[in-house]
C-alpha cells in the first residue's frame, strides 16, 4: 500500500511512502485484538474497592434492645447487615485485575489494528515538523488543514518531543505519543492515525 505524504498545510509534498504489508496489510485477528484490549483495560483498574463488614463498621457493641418483650425480631448489634448503617455482606474487597498477554499476541493485535485502520483509509502521513515554542494554534491549524479538526486523532511521533506534546495536550480529541508506545487500544480508540513520516520507521523497528 502506498500513501502520499502531506505537509502541515494539507497539501501533497510529491513524496510517496510504501507501507509494509505485514503491518498495514495483514489479516485482521479480532481474537488477538480482543485479548489485548481486554488486558489493557483490566490493567488500568486500581482494584482498591473495599466495603466494610459488620466486624469493621464502627460501633454496634451494645445490644440495641432487650431480647424479649418488644415484639421486634431479636438483634444483637446495630451493625448487623440487616440494619441501616450496618456492614456489607459479600462486599467488594481489594484485588488485582492484571491480565497477562503474550508478546506475540500483543504484536499480532497491534498489526491487526493498524491493518484495520489502513483498510478503512484512516491512516495519514505528514512530513516531519518542529515547533519553535509551545503553542496550541499551529497544531490546531494543521489538524484543520488536514480535515481532522472534528475527529479523534492519534498522532504518532518518532521520539518524544516536549514542545509538540505540550502544544497538543490542550486539544481534547488529540492523543500524541511515540510510535513504539501506541497500544492496540490507542489505535482503535481513534478515528484516524496520523504519522509523522519518520515515525513509520520507528514502528517498523518495533514490530520487526
Curated annotation (Swiss-Prot):
Keyword rRNA-binding applies: yes
InterPro entries: Ribosomal_uL4 (IPR002136), Ribosomal_uL4-like (IPR013005), Ribosomal_uL4_dom_sf (IPR023574)
GO cellular component term of the entry, any: ribosome
Record keywords, A-Z: Ribonucleoprotein, Ribosomal protein, RNA-binding, rRNA-binding
GO annotation (BP), single: translation
Subunit structure as annotated in this protein's UniProt entry: Part of the 50S ribosomal subunit.
Similarity comment text for this entry: Belongs to the universal ribosomal protein uL4 family.
Described purpose of this protein according to its UniProt entry: One of the primary rRNA binding proteins, this protein initially binds near the 5'-end of the 23S rRNA. It is important during the early stages of 50S assembly. It makes multiple contacts with different domains of the 23S rRNA in the assembled 50S subunit and ribosome.
Identification of the protein by name: Large ribosomal subunit protein uL4
Species whose genome carries this gene: Chlorobium luteolum (strain DSM 273 / BCRC 81028 / 2530) (Pelodictyon luteolum)
Name of the gene this protein is made from: rplD
Amino acid at each position: 500500500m502506498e500513501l502520499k505524504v502531506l505537509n502541515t498545510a494539507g497539501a501533497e509534498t510529491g513524496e510517496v511512502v510504501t507501507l509494509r504489508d505485514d503491518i498495514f496489510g495483514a489479516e485482521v485477528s479480532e481474537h488477538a485484538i480482543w485479548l489485548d484490549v481486554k488486558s489493557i483495560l483490566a490493567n488500568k483498574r486500581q482494584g482498591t474497592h473495599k466495603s466494610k463488614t459488620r466486624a469493621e463498621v464502627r460501633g454496634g457493641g451494645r445490644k440495641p434492645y432487650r431480647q424479649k418483650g418488644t415484639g421486634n425480631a431479636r438483634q444483637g448489634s446495630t451493625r448487623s447487615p440487616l440494619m441501616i448503617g450496618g456492614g456489607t455482606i459479600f462486599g467488594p474487597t481489594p484485588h488485582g485485575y492484571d491480565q497477562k498477554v503474550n508478546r506475540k499476541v500483543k504484536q499480532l493485535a497491534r498489526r491487526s489494528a493498524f491493518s484495520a485502520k489502513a483498510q478503512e483509509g484512516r491512516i495519514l502521513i505528514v512530513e516531519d515538523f518542529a515547533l519553535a515554542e509551545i503553542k496550541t494554534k499551529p497544531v490546531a491549524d494543521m489538524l484543520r488543514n488536514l480535515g481532522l479538526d472534528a475527529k479523534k486523532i492519534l498522532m504518532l511521533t518518532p521520539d518524544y518531543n516536549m514542545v509538540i506534546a505540550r502544544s497538543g495536550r490542550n486539544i481534547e480529541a488529540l492523543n500524541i505519543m511515540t510510535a513504539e508506545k501506541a497500544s492496540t487500544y490507542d489505535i482503535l480508540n481513534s478515528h484516524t492515525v496520523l504519522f509523522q513520516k519518520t515515525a513509520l520507521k520507528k514502528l517498523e523497528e518495533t514490530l520487526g
